Amino acid sequence: MKLSLSRRDFGLMAAQITVGAAGTTLFGLPSALAQQKSVNLGTFGGIDAQNYIRAKNSMAQTFGPGAKVDYVTVRAGSEVISAMAGGSLDMCNIGSSPMVVGYANGLAASMVYAYKSIIDSEALVVQNSSGIKTVGELKGKRIGLPFNTSVHFAALAALKGAGLGPGDVQLINMRADTIASAWTRRELDASYIWVPVIPRLVEDGGTIIFKTGDLATTQGLAMFDGFLVRDEFKKQNPDLVLAFLKDFDTIAREFKQNPKEVVATMTKFLSVDEAAVMRSLNTFYPISAKEQITSKWMGKPGEKDTGVAKTLKVQADFLKESGQISTVPKDVGAMVDSSFAMKLAA
């Protein structure tokens, strides 16, 4: 399958961890389920729940003795899609926009869980010196952001809500790690980006004028990152997928509710300061299994009129309009599989 998704060079770093623990796996799943299994888990390497799982090595218990876990570090949703297309990545959290791009290009993968609700972890920041106060005042201005990402979609949606289209502004495709320096050089009037870049821009003469969470009130869109799983892996290893999601559900609550433990773990694991960890904690909003299967989010298996399905369809339309995909999938909501969430919610 050919995917024209690259907005940055594909770079994956794999750290193999051979798991060895006796007895049964976490949540009482027999360790025999996981023996001789190989699982490639993606992580963006930042201060998030997925990397907290890696730091705690909780998968050693979840997958049991004999299981081999490879942690694959990715830098963007496009890398997740490319790695899954090549079979080198089985499960990873990903923004909903690149998820749609992958599905539209024939990637055989499913969203099995909403990783988090996006409220204030993504935002549109403007230079104070620009005098811009509203989204509608961005006409003709330079906006830096990484293309084929959730912030790309959010930016287009915010502009549309203000009566502007992509042609009314200068959208500049940039890696997240280059935006802060361009901002300092005043080469940008605005940027739509995520934490931890947001506070750096604010500290360097910026003001937030729009948050991705605002799309829920202005356009009725539930914004989220999701867990994507290769369909072949899901079919062959449903018990491992369920075990992983059970562990994530527990870790996500701990990540949010036990800041002292998270700070102690992540500052050591990533060599970052406490303030950086707290910024991520304060912008992370997990969704419980029972919430996942409501119509606001994924809904129950077979349910069509859901918040996730609506958001994916709107995103697909935006991606087609902006030339990021050639056709809109007939049923983009078909990529959602809430059967695992149903089992967790029972």
Question: How would you label these PLM feature ranges?
Answer:
Residues K235-E321:
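Secondary-structure end/capping motifs
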Residues S97, T178-L270:
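Pocket-lining segment of extracytoplasmic ligand-binding domains
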